[in-house]
Regions:
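Active-site anion-handling motifs in enzyme catalytic cores
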Residues: 1-260
Length: 260
């Protein structure tokens, strides 16, 4: 919302398609009105969650389908069952508020220790350098006890999507601080443990009726790591329906491309 203006995406005679998006969180009616006006001027809008769709369903050009990443072809990715947990780390000061930083780091360190005791190897994964994921990983890693560090490695995404997907595929569990860490984990048949900094991940999990413990950065004091069961760490979900539904994001665009 910061610095928002009443944007216009109509851009002359060119048709515009806005696919795979969510809306929120938002604070002001003015911001909502600006986005509503902007979306009313594009050819097609396809949201990834029902919460966002319901906010704009009065517009005739608005649709909803499963998250667009479910449509990715991952058939060439080497999936393993290595007892490893991918932990997608975020920087609280960039994604939510710096006041959560200390408590977030303490909870991640507790989780790392908890998983190592259960026999997991750990990979701390950065999805976004510009939002300081890597800096946060270095801070957390520096606080891991020396006798546990041999079980922990780091992976920094550098634009090589296939390499990143293979890294995630070489695991059993994805602890998703980044929204799409959870979605990719589900696509690859992994168990997931979401870490929320806003409700956008929650909205999609609710749409999918996924029942898993959720670590909410905004309410860390109420989450007991020891409450996570072995069943929680090994639960799997059938997402074939979502993989098929996600293809619908492109249906209007495909029609347009066939005309040109």
């Amino acid at each position: 919302e910061r610095g928002d203006t009443n944007r216009d995406f109509s851009l002359g005679k060119n048709k515009r398609y806005v696919l795979g998006i969510n809306f929120g969180p938002y604070k002001t009616q003015e911001y909502y009105n600006n986005i509503h006006n902007m979306l009313s001027n594009v050819e097609d809008v396809c949201f990834r969650d029902k919460y966002s769709y319901n906010l704009f369903k009065d517009l005739p050009n608005v649709r909803q389908a499963a998250d667009i990443v479910f449509s990715m072809d991952m058939s060439n990715i080497k999936n393993t069952n290595r007892k490893r947990a991918i932990i997608s780390i975020i920087s609280p000061k960039d994604k939510i508020n710096k006041k959560y930083k200390k408590q977030y780091e303490e909870k991640m360190l507790e989780l790392i220790s908890f998983l190592i005791v259960k026999g997991y190897e750990i990979c701390l994964m950065s999805f976004c350098k510009i939002e300081h994921d890597e800096e946060e990983i270095e801070e957390i890693y520096s606080k891991i006890p020396e006798n546990q560090k041999k079980k922990v490695e780091k992976y920094y995404y550098n634009g090589n999507i296939e390499e990143a997907l293979n890294t995630i595929a070489d695991s059993q569990l994805v602890v998703g601080g980044r929204f799409h860490a959870n979605i990719i984990g589900l696509c690859l048949g992994k168990s997931i443990l979401p870490v929320l900094y806003s409700d956008k991940t929650l909205h999609v999990l609710q749409d999918m009726q996924i029942d898993t413990p959720i670590i909410d950065i905004r309410n860390l004091e109420s989450f007991d790591i020891k409450s996570i069961t072995d069943d929680d760490l090994t639960r799997h979900y059938d997402v074939e329906k979502q993989k098929e539904d996600a293809q619908r994001h492109f249906e209007k665009l495909d029609l347009q491309l066939k005309k040109t």
